[in-house]
Amino acid sequence: GMDNKIMYGEDIAPDEKNDIIQDLTYVMILKNFGKSMKIEKPINYDPSEFYCSTSSINCPESDKALWSPDQMMNYGKLPNDKIMINWPIYGNDYYSNLLEMNEDQRKVVFKKAKEKSMRYLYYIQNELGFDNYSISDEEYDTKDNFPLIPYYREARRISGITTFSLNYIKKPYDQVNPLYRTGILVGDYPV
């Protein structure tokens, strides 16, 4: 969840910490089979669930649907004509806070998350026109070809010698530790 303002002195943090975590995703590795590989229509499929995942005239929040279908498909491009689908914007993310759940409850959540990914695959194939892509059978040693565990975008901060916070970005020269003089690994997360 989110740290409170006091923990790291970040003015954008909430006053009280909470246990709200980011969505989980059952990532799909899609492979270009070179021919139509449409899956059967999943139960509870409703295309409107995904209209805003890419730019679409059907998206009621068109100002938020900034990515074209091609850009979404290229976001997770892999070698050998494969694509990783891990799309947080009205895609295959699934919210559930597992922290307080027992193993049986978590299994139900994981099943629902996989079902959402399958609905998104159906949308990709039928609404976006990428019917030559389907789940690769070469990636994971599982019956359903999904990863063994879901992906989370979130992790707790590491409490090290120095803990990096937003303040080191906003006011780098006003901090106790002169991190602006050190190297920092920065990733590009274009979503």
Q: What positions do the PLM features span?
A:
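Flavin (FAD/FMN)-binding glycine-rich loop and adjacent Rossmann-like elements that form
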Residues: G1-V191
